[in-house]
Every structure is written in structure tokens, then in C-alpha cells.
Amino acid sequence: MATTYLTLTNSVLRELNETELTSSTFSSSRGIQTAVKDFINKGIHDIYNETGEIPLLYARTTQDLTVGDNEYSFPTDFRKADMDSFVLKPRELVTNGEFASNITSWTTGDGSPSYTSSGNGRLNLNDAAAYQAINTTVNKTYKIQVRVLSPNSSTTGLIIRVGTSAGGTQNLNTTQAVTNFREGAILNTTFTASAQTSYIYLEAPSVQLDVDYVRISRSDIATRKLTYVTYDSFLQNNKPTDDTNNSSNYSVPLRVYILPDHSAFGISPRPNTNEFTVSYDYYTTHTDLSAHGDNMSLPDRFRTLIVDRAKYYTYMLRSDPQHAQLADRDFQRKLRLLKVDYATKNDYMRSDVIGESIATNIGGRVS
């Protein structure tokens, strides 16, 4: 169980022989109690500032690209981006196609579609149908992938249609049968859009079937890693072309850079379609503890690390440098243990001479 703000505060107060707080008196703390509460958060700040890329602050996000736009803001909780993690891929057009926790964004076409928590979450169709409208580009070809399972071991197939209206068959009309009842079956096919709005329609007639996921994206967009370049390199080599007022310079993005103020990232060349998505990893800023029941993000075994840092600041407040030095020594020792657990990486030398995505292990681990 994660350690609460109240527990951390009382751990420090107890070692200082001060009056402890309760859940009812926590918000009305006074004097040294309030100072210790502040020092708890200050100590947590120190830990995260010392470790930087701590996995507990790791996050992954995506950014949909817009034709002609080359700079995009980082999330509000952004701290630091892994610039080697930027990947360009086709935009996923289906909303909530994984059915992770519900079937919102899907409209009932017939019967009573429902959500089931089986697997990672599924759309349950028991003599029912559901559909969703998606944005498409006329005359462009799209990949569609649907995984279907039969909980009652029925071989009756799932009807899958794509058209210009709900249930329309202008672009696709097929059936995916299930014979392997444990693994289910996966439909992999394509369709060419004939309208700006297309409808994906799923129907299980007179049978119960579960849909694990529905995925649709452009077939002519390949997933590729974006090459990181410095902002200076972008200014010298790419910006003049990218800023030319000519849409013929728009193309498939190849490079990514970060702005000097670290508020946004840029891609080059400017995208030539709205159907690109960029995914990347970043590290978040942490949120200060506030209420007595707030939990620290670090594992419980590092509780004393925060306590030692708060004690250090408290002793400094009391003009007690000797005890402050002892508390700091304990903090530094435990901080090294945390870095061993979370901040140590197996780094290897790489050569990017042959290709952007080829990493060559030249000399083993770099110590």
C-alpha cells in the first residue's frame, strides 16, 4: 500500500519529537507541522530532479498531424521527451476501437450491443449490430483489421460492412467466420473510400459474437522512426525549404526537432496529409501532495528517502547543521540505491552511418 502524505509527515514529526497530526487536524497544521509538510514536497522535488528519467514518471502520447503545420505543443505535464522515441504512423481512424473499458462512440444498429470485460475489453453483439462514422479521403485505400471471437462456439460469422451510410456496402461487404474458438479469427483486408465520411458496420445475426478490436488506417502510410536533428541543424538545412510558401514541399515527415524553449517539437518536412500520427515517450512532472490521503508515487521502500530529506530541511530551519549533515548523508546513500534501481541504463555505442534504424553494437556496454 502506498505511503500517504499524513504518514510521511508524521514520520518526520515523530523523529523530531513534535506533535503528530491526524486526518482531521492535517489541514489546520501550524508552525513546525506546516513546515514539515512543505519539506516533504520539497524532498520529493529533489528526488525527481536528481534522477530525471525515472520510470515512475514515464508516459506515452500521440499527436495527430495537420497538413502544412510543423510545430506541435508538448502535453501540459511535460518534463522531458525521449527524442529517439518519435515514430510516424498512419492515424487510427476508429474511436474506441479497442473497447478497453466501454463501447462509447459506437451507435446501435440493431438489437442491444453491450460491453464485456473479457480479455482486454470487447464489444458483445448478441443478435445485434453496431456502427461508427469515420473521416476518410475519397479514392484512398484503407487497411481494416477486426478480431472476432465466438464465446458460444458458433461458426456463424461476423458481418463487416463499410459504406456511405450505416449498413451500406459501397466499399466493403464481407463475413468473418470463427473456427478457432479460443483464439478467434482476424479479418485483414482493405477498402477504397468513396466519400469523406465512411461507416464501419458490425453485425452478429442470430448469434453471440465478441469483437476484440477494430482498426482502420491508411494503407499507403508506412510506420517509420523519425530521425532526431538539433534545432540548429534544422535551421541550417531544412527550415528554408519548409518555410517556402509552396505546398509541393509538403511530404512525408522524416525528421523531428525540439524548440529551444522545450515547449514544442517540430517535424520536417511539413506533412502533406491529415492522416499522420506521431507517437513518442516523455517524462512527466509530478504533482505535489496536498490532502492527507494523497499517496506518494515512489514505492514504499523509498519512504525513508523522503523522510531523510525533509529532516534535513527541518534541521537547517532549526540551525542545526550537525544533524542536517547526518540526514543529508542518509539521503544521499539511499538516493544512490534508487538510481541503481531506476536510473541505470545499458548503453551501447551505435552507428547511424548505414541507416537511421540500424543500431550496431560496436564495443559492448559503455561504462
Q: Where do the PLM segments sit?
A:
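Glycine-enriched, solvent-exposed interface loops adjoining structured elements
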Residues: 1-97, 104-107, 176-182, 203-208, ...
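Extra-cytoplasmic beta-strand recognition segments
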Residues: 99, 127-155, 185-190, 214
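Short carbohydrate-recognition loop motifs
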Residues: 111-129
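Surface-exposed coil/turn segments at beta-strand junctions on protein surfaces, enriched
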Residues: 125, 137-139, 180-182, 193-195, ...
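Beta-strand secondary-structure signal
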Residues: 131, 143-147, 159, 188, ...
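Beta-strand acidic-aromatic groove motif in beta-rich domains, primarily in extracellular
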Residues: 153-164
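Extracellular beta-strand ligand-recognition surfaces/modules
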Residues: 158, 186-215
